[in-house]
Amino acid sequence: MLQVYTGTGKGKTTAALGVALRASGYGMKTLMLSFLKDDPEYGEARAAKNLPWFTLRQVGRDAFVNFHNPDPVDLKMCRDGWEEAKKAISSHAADVIILDELNIVLATQMLPTQEVVDFLREHKNNVEVIT
């Protein structure tokens, strides 16, 4: 299953975390890959340390990202994060996999949209994926 949360402002990450919380109530594991973020002080990063069913990997860096001219480091981190996501989805590493901020990565062409869409379509029955 694929769920896509879009729009401006707050609520997308919170909605995904709500699904993760509900899933944990049924004994399901969640993996959250957080693109464009790397700050251990984010609330979700702090909470993840106390939740054995919830794994958070921040696959971005704690720096401003120039979406019009992204730094090669940011592009590589997005690519590496996407490769990690593909492995997790393919291997069913968790019951719920949240790809936080992936929509921004795609909208700013930091990853090829068609590649991501094709992969997610091909693996839509593996796990529940939220972007």
Where are the regions a protein language model picked out?
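Phosphate-binding/switch loop-helix module in NTP-utilizing enzymes
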Residues: 66-128
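Conserved P-loop
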Residues: 2-90
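Residue-level preference for the first positions of well-ordered beta-strands
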Residues: 1-4, 31, 95-96, 128-130
